[in-house]
């Protein structure tokens, strides 16, 4: 893989993790392709969800590999109650081993989300993030100074493009139970569809955000507090912001940056809006004051 795009203080750890992922893609594919990979276990993870077999197998594989990196001090999976910590190292990893596992049996796009933190698990300490999506193609998205898209081919990740969101998109991925949507959100969505926006919600957050990114604009929303800050929300928020979009939530009707949220507990959840600038403006107009 060509690492010429990665510069700055945190470039080396990003390169190390990508190199690790590049070597591990085939093993991950094997895990996902097993006939019973989508079968539910009888366990319950720290977030109260029932993991599928592929969740646990990928988690074990990733944890072992992340801990093998000398500069990693702590590794934290959403499947675990607390982080696994070493004596040495500078960086901390929080990851969702298999985002979208609930739709895997339908053969929808799933992925691994990774946040790289420094010193402590806080939004302000998130220095880079990335995800890998598994479908008929395998792609990697990396946020450091900018956002870079890669495709896996012949055992390597190949650079495709630098992602920059346009001011306005044409797709909407609105997750959650619509009967619980606020009046403001319902009006915003009605306005988008009146402008011929297309609904592109799959039930896999990483897939839906990936769609917004490769289409260069649009909006992903999940207004209920269901998504985990450290493992899903913060890493994808960083990618959206580095792509010149906006990542936010509403606190008593006031729009605020997701990456300025505090974290009171490891598995704390948040509402989440990820959008290009025009869609962010429309959402604020309708949800302000609610």
From Swiss-Prot:
Note describing how the cofactor binds: Binds 2 magnesium ions per subunit.
GO terms, biological process: fructose 1,6-bisphosphate metabolic process; fructose 6-phosphate metabolic process; fructose metabolic process; gluconeogenesis; sucrose biosynthetic process
Keyword field contains Kinase: no
Cofactor(s) needed by this chain: Mg(2+)
UniProt-annotated binding residues for Mg(2+) 2: 96, 99, 232
Keywords noted in UniProt: Carbohydrate metabolism, Cytoplasm, Hydrolase, Magnesium, Metal-binding
Catalytic activity: beta-D-fructose 1,6-bisphosphate + H2O = beta-D-fructose 6-phosphate + phosphate
Binding site for substrate: 99-102, 201, 226
GO cellular component: cytosol
Keyword Cytoplasm set for record: yes
Residues that hold Mg(2+) 1 according to the record: 78, 96, 98
E.C. number(s) listed in UniProt: 3.1.3.11
Assembly description: Homotetramer.
HAMAP family, per database record: FBPase_class1 (MF_01855)
Entry's family note: Belongs to the FBPase class 1 family.
The name this protein goes by in its record: Fructose-1,6-bisphosphatase class 1
Gene behind the chain: fbp
């Amino acid at each position: 893989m060509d690492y010429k795009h990665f510069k700055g203080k945190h470039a080396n750890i990003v390169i190390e993790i990508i190199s690790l992922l590049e070597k591990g893609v085939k093993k991950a594919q094997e895990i996902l392709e097993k006939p019973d990979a989508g079968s539910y276990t009888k366990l319950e993870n720290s977030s109260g969800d029932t993991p599928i077999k592929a969740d646990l197998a990928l988690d074990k594989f990733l944890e072992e590999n992340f801990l093998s990196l000398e500069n990693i001090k702590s590794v934290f999976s959403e499947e675990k109650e607390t982080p696994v910590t070493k004596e040495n190292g500078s960086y901390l990893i929080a990851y969702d081993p298999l985002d979208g596992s609930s739709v895997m049996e339908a053969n929808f796009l799933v992925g691994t989300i990774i946040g790289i933190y420094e010193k402590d698990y806080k939004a302000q300490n998130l220095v880079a993030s990335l995800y890998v999506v598994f479908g008929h193609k395998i792609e990697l998205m990396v946020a450091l100074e900018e956002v870079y898209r890669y495709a896996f081919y012949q055992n390597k990740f190949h650079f495709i493009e630098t992602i920059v969101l346009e001011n306005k998109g044409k797709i909407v991925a609105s997750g959650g139970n619509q009967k619980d949507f606020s009046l403001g959100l319902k009006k915003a969505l009605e306005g988008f569809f009146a402008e011929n926006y297309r609904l592109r919600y799959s039930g896999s957050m990483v897939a839906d955000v990936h769609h917004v990114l490769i289409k260069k604009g649009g909006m992903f929303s999940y207004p209920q507090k269901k998504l985990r800050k450290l493992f899903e929300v913060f890493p994808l928020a960083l990618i959206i912001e580095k792509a010149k979009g906006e990542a936010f939530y509403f606190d008593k009707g006031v729009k605020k940056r997701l990456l300025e949220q505090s974290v009171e507990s490891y598995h704390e959840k948040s509402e989440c809006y990820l959008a290009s600038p025009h869609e962010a403006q429309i959402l604020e107009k309708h949800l302000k004051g609610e």
